[in-house]
Each structure stands twice: as structure tokens, then as C-alpha cells.
């Protein structure tokens, strides 16, 4: 694939990164979110293997990303901006997914009905507020040094995915044009 013009490999395995280190002629190695890049030492190791881009997962706080970017400004940084995340995992859920034996929340943004001890339905309420979309604050991430944004689409209907892409593109252009 390297000889066929592939420009980058997004890799989620340290062993494979180590094996490819220094062997690619054209393609770059990009560190997948699945590697769990959460601190400066991890980035230091990945850089020593020749990784050129770090793809941040949205569960890092902005100040954590900035610390890494400021330590290694020569690397490229990317953020998963939409989709592919569990809001419980990125610190936006207010309750666990399973409330009781009788109640299971399919998504964190779903409404639910709570039951009292006699299994009588109580007032329904939202478990979590709709989270802020990265598109709405993309300028903050761009100012921090993140220049690329991914939109995961496997779990989002096409119609919704298209609107996410359009929104993200518009916000990036607004920030870029001042």
C-alpha cells in the first residue's frame, strides 16, 4: 500500500507501529484514538516510532490536549468531532446506562421514566442534556493547534451525518476567515 500511494495509515496497535517504524517510504503513521493517547509520555513514545499525527479522542479535556500540543508542536493533531462516542465515556452523562433491573437507557440523550419502589411510573425526565457539538466550538480547538476533524458515520443516519459535515465545514470556514 505504501508503494501504491497511500498517504497515511491510522494504526491502533503499538506493536504494528513499532514494526512499521522507519520502514514506510511514502506513507505516514497516524495514531488512532484506540491507542489511548492521553498524556505527554505516550506522545513521546509514539513520536520516537515516527508517528506524525495524533488523533485525539473527545474524552480529553482541552487543557490536556493543549499541554500535549505545546510539548510537541511539530506533530499534526486531529479530533473526532462528531459521532463514535459514548457520552458516558466523555464525561457528559449524569447517570449510568442501567438505572435499575427494569430500566435500561439505550442512549444517554434518551428520555426515561423513573419508577418508585412499588414500580409506579414517576415523572419522565431527560437523563442528560444534549451535549455541545464540537462544530459549535471548533474555533477553540483550531486555536489550540488542532487542524483536522473526523466525523464518524457508522452510527449516525446519513441525513444527520450530512448536516454534521456541513455544520462543521461552515464553522471551520467562519473561524478561518476571522
What residue spans do the PLM features occupy?
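Residues lining hydrophobic/aromatic ligand-binding pockets adjacent to catalytic sites
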Residues: 51
Amino acid at each position: 500500500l505504501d508503494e501504491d500511494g497511500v498517504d497515511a495509515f491510522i494504526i491502533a496497535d503499538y506493536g504494528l507501529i513499532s514494526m512499521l517504524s522507519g520502514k514506510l517510504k511514502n506513507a505516514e503513521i497516524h495514531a488512532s484514538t484506540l491507542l489511548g493517547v492521553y498524556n505527554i509520555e505516550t506522545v513521546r513514545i509514539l513520536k520516537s516510532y515516527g508517528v506524525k499525527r495524533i488523533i485525539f479522542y473527545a474524552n480529553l479535556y482541552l487543557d490536556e490536549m493543549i499541554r500535549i500540543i505545546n510539548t510537541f508542536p511539530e506533530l499534526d493533531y486531529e479530533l473526532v468531532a462528531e459521532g463514535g462516542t459514548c457520552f458516558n465515556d466523555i464525561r457528559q452523562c449524569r447517570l449510568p446506562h442501567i438505572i435499575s433491573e427494569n430500566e435500561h437507557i439505550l442512549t444517554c440523550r434518551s428520555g426515561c421514566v423513573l419508577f418508585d419502589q412499588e414500580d409506579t411510573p414517576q415523572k419522565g425526565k431527560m437523563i442528560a442534556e444534549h451535549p455541545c457539538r464540537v462544530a459549535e466550538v471548533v474555533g477553540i480547538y483550531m486555536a489550540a493547534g488542532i487542524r483536522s476533524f473526523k466525523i464518524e458515520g457508522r452510527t449516525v443516519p446519513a441525513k444527520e451525518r450530512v448536516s454534521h459535515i456541513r455544520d462543521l465545514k461552515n464553522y471551520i470556514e467562519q473561524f478561518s476567515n476571522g
